Amino acid sequence: MSETFIYPQANLIAGVDEVGRGPLVGAVVTAAVILDPNRPIVGLADSKKLSEKRRLSLYDEITEKALSWSLGRAEPEEIDQLNILHAAMLAMQRAVSGLHIVPDYVLIDGNRCPKLQMPSLAVVKGDSRVAEISAASILAKVTRDREMTELDLLFPEYGFAQHKGYPTAFHLEKLAALGATVHHRRSFGPVKRVLGLV
């Protein structure tokens, strides 16, 4: 972990992260994780810096060893209604409230915290500085990637399994040629343009 993080004085600390702010399609997915100090997990890092194979292996280890973990999400309709930032905050709240053990402190990746029932702190680059946030980033990323692979089976022509819904040249080309699916975020510029909403 880079730039040593000084932990707050707390017994049960949850880490929270989100995946999927940038894609044009699908939910924004969040995870909250309380790690077990007696069952350390080696190799936790920002999910974006790990190979897919390593992420999958760590996913299994985290879900098995964590004291508690939970996923949250906000669907495309909620993203369009609220905007992506507020939808991500809502999904984080859902992840924290889904924990079966109530944390006494929550550390969140980024520079902004959602409203929670307990003290919280936003940690810039938290996914590479805080083990709990790294674990949350891995759970959220693996979950969302799996959803994109499933969506790819329904809409193979869009290539969701490859680009995970991000606005790559290929995705934009297919969006222009084929139009938007019901899973596309209508409030996002490229989708708006295709639907003639701009």
Swiss-Prot record:
GO term, biological process aspect, one: DNA replication, removal of RNA primer
Coiled-coil residues are none
Q: What is its main location?
A: cytoplasm
One Pfam family per UniProt: RNase_HII
For whether the record's keyword set contains Phosphoprotein, the answer is: no
Transmembrane portions of the chain: none
InterPro entries documented for this protein: RNase_HII, RNase_HII/HIII, RNase_HII/HIII_dom, RNaseH-like_sf, RNaseH_sf
Listed EC numbers: 3.1.26.4
**Which compartment or compartments is the protein found in?**
Cytoplasm
Its cofactor is: Mn(2+); Mg(2+)
GO CC, any one term = ribonuclease H2 complex
Per its record, the protein catalyses: Endonucleolytic cleavage to 5'-phosphomonoester
Sorted alphabetically, the keyword list is: Cytoplasm, Endonuclease, Hydrolase, Manganese, Metal-binding, Nuclease
Q: Where does a divalent metal cation bind?
A: D17, E18, D109
Gene Ontology MF, one: RNA-DNA hybrid ribonuclease activity
Cofactor: bound how, per the entry note? Manganese or magnesium. Binds 1 divalent metal ion per monomer in the absence of substrate. May bind a second metal ion after substrate binding.
Record-annotated RNase H type-2 domain positions? 11-198
> Which family, according to UniProt?
Belongs to the RNase HII family.
Q: So what does this one do? A: Endonuclease that specifically degrades the RNA of RNA-DNA hybrids.
- NCBIfam families cross-referenced by the UniProt entry: PRK00015.1-1, PRK00015.1-3, PRK00015.1-4
Q: What is this protein called?
A: Ribonuclease HII
Q: Gene for this protein?
A: rnhB
